Amino acid sequence: MKKQRNLRSMAAQAVEQVVEQGQSLSNILPPLQQKVSDKDKALLQELCFGVLRTLSQLDWLINKLMARPMTGKQRTVHYLIMVGLYQLLYTRIPPHAALAETVEGAVAIKRPQLKGLINGVLRQFQRQQEELLAEFNASDACYLHPSWLLKRLQKAYPEQWQSIVEANNQRPPMWLRVNRTHHSRDSWLALLDEAGMKGFPHADYPDAVRLETPAPVHVLPGFEEGWVTVQDASAQGCMAWLAPQNGEHILDLCAAPGGKTTHILEVAPEAQVVAVDIDEQRLSRVYDNLKRLGMKATVKQGDGRYPSQWCGEQQFDRILLDAPCSATGVIRRHPDIKWLRRDRDIPELAQLQSEILDAIWPHLKSGGTLIYATCSVLPEENSLQIKAFLQRTADAELCETGTPEQPGKQNLPGAEEGDGFFYAKLIKK
């Protein structure tokens, strides 16, 4: 039996690690969830994701409610108060229970002397909630995005930035990819229906299913047997452009965690696939996905800027480059991105993408296809990146995705209920 732990203090410490230390929630949360009971796993996730989604609002409220900020060793208390405010604002947890558990969190973080302070701040919010929220909603903080990102979105999308921001602040739907080597989408949907769940097929992507209500993977029919994989609809769109064929040599570059690697093999089971990623730790997830789906690929650790180190002079029929990016298209799925990224990261990422594109292009066969993809919505990483590449690369030709002046296809967050995603299809003359 799991030891009873204070979930509010655990959430506060996790959020603090993201905001103050720049750690990714996807690395922090799973080990924490192993320490709590199954019924508490979902609440811990809700508290962490929710606080990060609404962080700027909670921070704004604390600055109004407290004379001076908590600093030094007491900084965790700042995040504990955030957890308390989030519960009062956004959950169905009875206010008395939210207050009691949050105040007790002070004991768990060894700050019992601050229980009175935490209780006082949260009760003050309850008394002043209406006036405070009215003032907040009239401020720029109401968009729940850092100012640098808001400015970039406003510049890139003067007519659409508000809808992008709104989509980023929503809870994401759960999309699945049916493994066509096991089941047709319709036959798997019938199994889902028998299991008491409902799913909806995507209009354009033949393997994509949206669950009516997100569910743990272990309850999905045949998940452990590889019948279905969790993957957003926009990410599944890569295969429509890549169009892999049996017998081809295909490179999946920046492949971890392996969702697109396995999708290639579902579409073309006899393709010779090489999956490469710079992060050796994340490559373990590629192996896990291949094993669960019963598939084989050559998996290598390597830097996309130096392909000769891991593939020599080899050339490929098709290359999928899912480039390292700001991930500004998947904020609704990973709200910590808003607080992990900095404005200065964007030109650095654009430079890295440019170097990888230039380095990998010679490894594409004449007549071959390269799909450049990101989960970003920023032009510097997307259309401007491809426009510059086409201008300096004489044997590269844009195909089916946009125009030379506005290259690529940009999906915005929430469009057709998918994530923000960019694709450009390039052919080597």
From Swiss-Prot:
Q: Which Gene3D superfamilies match?
A: Helix hairpin bin, NusB-like, Sun protein, domain 3, Vaccinia Virus protein VP39
- Reactions the enzyme catalyzes: cytidine(967) in 16S rRNA + S-adenosyl-L-methionine = 5-methylcytidine(967) in 16S rRNA + S-adenosyl-L-homocysteine + H(+)
Taxonomic superkingdom = Bacteria
PROSITE patterns according to UniProt: NOL1_NOP2_SUN, SAM_MT_RSMB_NOP
Which cysteines link up through disulfide bonds? none
| GO annotation (BP), single | rRNA base methylation
What keywords are assigned to this protein?
A: Cytoplasm, Methyltransferase, RNA-binding, rRNA processing, S-adenosyl-L-methionine, Transferase
A GO CC annotation recorded here is: cytosol
PANTHER family, alphabetized: NOL1_NOP2_SUN FAMILY PROTEIN _ ANTITERMINATION NUSB DOMAIN-CONTAINING PROTEIN, NOP2 YEAST -RELATED NOL1/NOP2/FMU SUN DOMAIN-CONTAINING
Q: What is this protein for, i.e. what is its function?
A: Specifically methylates the cytosine at position 967 (m5C967) of 16S rRNA.
Q: What name is this protein filed under? A: Ribosomal RNA small subunit methyltransferase B
Query: What species is this protein from?
Result: Escherichia coli O17:K52:H18 (strain UMN026 / ExPEC)
- Please name the gene that encodes this protein: rsmB
